[in-house]
Structure formats: C-alpha cells, structure tokens
Amino acid sequence: MTYYHASPAGGLQVLELRKSPYFDKPTQVCLTSLRAMALFYLIRNYEYAYGYTRQGKLYFDEPFPDALKKLYAGKSGWLYTCEEGNYEKTEIPNEFVSSQPVRVLDAEYIPDAYEAFLHEQEAGNILLLDYAHFASDPEKFAKKRAWLEKAISEEIRKKAIWKAPDSDCARYYLENYPEIWEHTLEEVIFHGKPEN
C-alpha cells in the first residue's frame, strides 16, 4: 500500500510527530492511502470539508461559495510518499496514523493545489461538489446550513475565538461565514439580547 502525507513545507526526509493546532488529536503523524485525500493537507486550514459517499467515493463539499478555489488556487506544497509501516487505521476512511516518526521515500512538488484537485476529478478520484449543488436543493441546503451553524458556533465558543477578532482563525470564520459569526457573537456577548 502507498502512504501519502502532504505539507506546505518542502525538503522533509522524516515526518516527525506533530500536534494539530486546529484539531483535538494526539501528537502523531497523519497519513492517507489516497492521493486525492492527501491534497487537502497541502494547506493549513481550520476545516476540511471532505467526506465519503455511501459507495466509498471521496468528495469535497464546498461549505461556502467558491471554497475550493478560494482555499487552494495558487497554493503550493509537497506530496510525500512514505515508507510502509504498521500504521494504525482511524475511523476516517483511508486515514492512518503513526506514533513514531515516518521516513519519506519520495516527494512531489504541487505548484497549484486547485489544479491538482481538478486533475484528480478528471481521473475519477474525487467528486468536487460546488456550493450551488446543495443550494439548489432547499431541504439539503437547510440541513447543511444548520449543521454548519451548529459546528462553527460551537468552535467559536469553545475556543473563545471571538475574543481575538484579529486572529487568522477569527478572520477565516468572519470572512467565510459572516452570518454565523454575527449570530454567535450576539449570543455570546449580548446573551441573545439586542445591544443597548
């Protein structure tokens, strides 16, 4: 089996254990057996909107208009092929983790992550679902928006992101989910009451 790891950093010979600054996961090396899935991690982001169909097909579901292009166009990074090992399988399809450093076997420079996703779609390795795909179905769209509002609002509250409005994370949520940001602030700061 081939194992991949993606990073904005080049020149890595060994993947060292890391703790994600954004997700509540242990210190580890994350790997995937699916090249298209690895591409998501060419950038550091606060959310990764991919999933799998019932048939096991990887998809990217844009959480806001033009998300894939906005997040990945013009972004470069490195796709590493790693040595085989006795890696632990996670609950996420095609994801593996290692509690030990992992040796890199090969590296591929990806000059534009967005273009790489388009090539993966052409090859049939991923479904890229644009925002309009769900917006055209009112019932699915309402469910998706409700889920996003709950998840993002909880994240903003739990990590007190609203207390640092100039942070990269706060700007990300404010720029891409302005209604959710404002609604959450109203609840947190004004406890649901209008400002006097």
Question: Which residues are covered by each model-predicted region?
Answer:
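Short, surface-exposed beta-edge/turn micro-motifs
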Residues: 1-2, 25-29, 35, 75-78
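Short, acidic Gly/Pro/Ser/Thr-rich loop/turn segments
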Residues: 11, 38, 87
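Short, well-structured hydrophobic secondary-structure segments
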Residues: 29-50
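ADP-ribose/NAD+-binding catalytic cleft of ART/PARP-like enzymes
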Residues: 1-26, 41-44
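A general structural signal for short secondary-structure junctions and capping/turn motifs
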Residues: 21-22, 29, 68-72
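Conserved NAD+-utilizing ADP-ribose enzyme module
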Residues: 44-196
